[in-house]
């Protein structure tokens, strides 16, 4: 399993989530975040608003999901965002107590 963390422009959040769900991702977590990229001017207290979308997926879906995100979230403008992928050792559905990929 992989955890995908997608940082996107707020106006592209819904399109990005729709693209992810179209590939078969069951659920997502969404947070409003603020940050500053490495190329941004180092102005104290100035951050840019973004949305963070988090989901955990089966390994075989990873490339399709990354391609879908890139297709809908890219405006070819600085500040489009980032995607981070990390390995997930295990998962637990607290209610059903199912573990592993069946829990996602």
What do the PLM-derived regions correspond to, one by one?
Residues 1-104:
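Positively charged, small/polar-rich N-terminal and surface patches that mediate targeting and assembly
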């Amino acid at each position: 399993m992989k955890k995908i963390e997608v940082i996107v422009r707020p106006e592209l959040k819904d399109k990005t989530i729709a693209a992810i769900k179209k590939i078969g991702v069951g659920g997502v977590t969404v947070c409003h975040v603020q940050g500053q990229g490495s190329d941004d001017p180092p102005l104290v207290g100035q951050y840019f608003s973004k949305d963070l979308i988090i989901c955990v997926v089966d390994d075989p879906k990873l490339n399709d999901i990354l391609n879908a995100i890139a297709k809908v979230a890219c405006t070819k403008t600085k500040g489009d965002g980032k995607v981070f992928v990390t390995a997930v050792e295990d998962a637990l559905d607290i209610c059903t107590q199912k573990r592993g990929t069946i829990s996602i």
